Each structure stands twice: as structure tokens, then as C-alpha cells.
Amino acid sequence: DALPISVLMQFIFTSCATICPLMSATFSHGQNALKEVHNRYRMYSISIDPEYDTPDRLAAYAKRNSASENWTFLTGSRGDIGKVMRAFDVLYQSNNKMYHQPYTFLRAHSDAPWIRIDGFLSVGELVHEFRIALRSMGTA
């Protein structure tokens, strides 16, 4: 039996000079450590600025952050991104992207609930939370 695919996700935008670089650095530096815990995982960074974050800009951002094949950067229409943000309850004050908050979402597998982590995570904390999510679902 193949192990289920786990998901880690965050909302970012490439022109952000405050929290996004820190969040992206955690994913970047955590890639190898996560793979040692559970090699079937995917990371997604979803842009909240689709007008600016073109696929080319996201590809350049991914390269700057040494994104592996497990880490995908997504964009879409403003309406579609809004739907995803509402589904994860990550709306921000006055629809001003500068007010967005650092959230990380984990899901051990497709039948598991999403786990929302508010605030910044170090690489060690990200790996720790990932282990807990996997153990709670009997995946690790």
C-alpha cells in the first residue's frame, strides 16, 4: 500500500516584505526535514495577489526559495482565491493584503481534518506539528 499524501499550505504574495519571506523560508528550510518524516507530502503556497503574482513571478519566487518538486506555488482569479481564503477562514481586514496573517495549514491525508496553526513557525516547530498530525491519523 502506498502511503497517503500529506499537505502543508500557506497564503503568501511575492511582493510582501514582512511575513511572507519568513513563512517561505520555513517551508524552504523545512523541505528536507519534512521528507525525512514522511516522504509523500506536498507543500502549497497560494498567492493572495493574483494581479501581481503571475506564473512567471511565482516561478522566480519558487527558484529564490529553492522550492523542490514537492512545493507548488498557485495563483488564480481574484474570485477563486477569495473562495479558497473564505474556505480556510483567512480573510483579512478591509481586503488589504498588507493585513494578512501568518497561517499554516496541515493535513495528514485526504480523510483527515485540516489543522490550522496561527503565527510563525520555526522549521523545528513545523516538523513537530507535522509529526503530531501524522501520528494522530496513524500515518507516521
Residue ranges of predicted features:
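Short, small-residue-biased leader/transition segments that mark boundaries at the very start
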Residues: 1-3
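Hydrophobic beta-strand anchors of alpha/beta hydrolase catalytic cores
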Residues: 8-9, 43, 104
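Conserved redox-active cysteine motifs that mediate thiol-disulfide chemistry
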Residues: 11-29
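Alpha-helical elements of the RecA-like P-loop NTPase motor core of helicases
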Residues: 18, 56, 82-83, 124, ...
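Structural microenvironment flanking redox-active thiols in thiol-disulfide oxidoreductases
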Residues: 23-73, 77-84
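Thiol/selenol-based redox catalytic cores and closely related redox-interacting motifs
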Residues: 67-125
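Non-globular targeting/processing and membrane-anchoring segments
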Residues: 127-140
